């Protein structure tokens, strides 16, 4: 099984002010380590495309995407798929990769979107997946404005479809999460786990393919240590990817 994992990285640019002087530093961070390890530990081949490489290297056609059984978008906004260097820097005509991703799923591929500040609608609405072909392929409706639900006190997920393959072998009790993106399940979607009244995990069919969402994060800060260390962490992602690939 082959997975293309996109996003889940960032650069922090800091300004340090000391008296009348200031200087800047930059730090590059990848947050996908535990997710990648969970999938690799189950024998799943993971190709990782960090956020800064997505605009230039994300596949440009449904046929190229079909080399992978499942595509995962995690904390990477729609603009990074729409604006390739060819278009943004050289004004060249290029494929609409959101449409190609929709065609990939419709043709039999699997798509998972994981939540974060640049997922779904995202912070200040900047992820911008509302009204796109990717939203068409997902089992949820995405809002137009900032959809973050911050829960510093922690929110405990509740299982609503215990028999779904995504939950096979998982512990009955779930750890707290510190936030998620608020979405609405489409008619016919299976809402497997909720945070309050909102979907945390939703799954559905689209054309000949499958899609799913996990509306919280696979990494900090919405994913606290108790979630990352939870015995169900690795099985959850393996189950989701296996289901999306049509193997469960």
PLM features: what roles do these ranges have?
Residues 8-18, 32, 106, 110-198:
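An acidic, glycine-rich "communication" segment
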């Amino acid at each position: 099984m082959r997975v293309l994992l996109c996003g889940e990285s960032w650069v922090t640019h800091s300004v340090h002010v000391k008296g009348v002087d200031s200087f800047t530093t930059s730090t590059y961070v990848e947050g996908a380590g535990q997710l990648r390890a969970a999938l690799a530990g189950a024998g799943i081949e993971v190709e990782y495309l960090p956020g800064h490489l997505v605009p230039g290297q994300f596949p440009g056609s449904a046929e190229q995407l079909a080399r992978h059984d499942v595509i995962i978008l995690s904390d990477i906004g729609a603009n990074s798929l729409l604006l390739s260097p060819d278009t943004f820097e050289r004004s060249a005509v290029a494929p609409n990769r959101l449409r190609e991703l929709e065609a990939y799923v419709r043709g039999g591929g699997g798509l998972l979107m994981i939540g974060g500040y640049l997922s779904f609608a995202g912070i200040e609405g900047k992820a911008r997946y509302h009204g796109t072909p990717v939203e068409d392929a997902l089992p949820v409706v995405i809002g137009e404005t900032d959809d973050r639900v911050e829960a510093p006190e922690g929110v405990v997920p509740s299982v609503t479809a215990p028999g779904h393959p995504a939950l096979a072998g998982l512990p009955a009790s779930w750890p707290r999460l510190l936030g998620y993106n608020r979405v609405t399940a489409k008619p016919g979607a299976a809402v497997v786990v909720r945070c309050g009244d909102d979907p945390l995990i939703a799954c559905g069919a689209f054309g000949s393919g499958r899609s799913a969402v996990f509306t919280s994060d696979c990494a900090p800060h919405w994913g606290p240590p108790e979630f990352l260390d939870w015995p169900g962490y690795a099985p959850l992602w393996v189950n989701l990817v296996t289901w999306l690939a049509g193997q469960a």
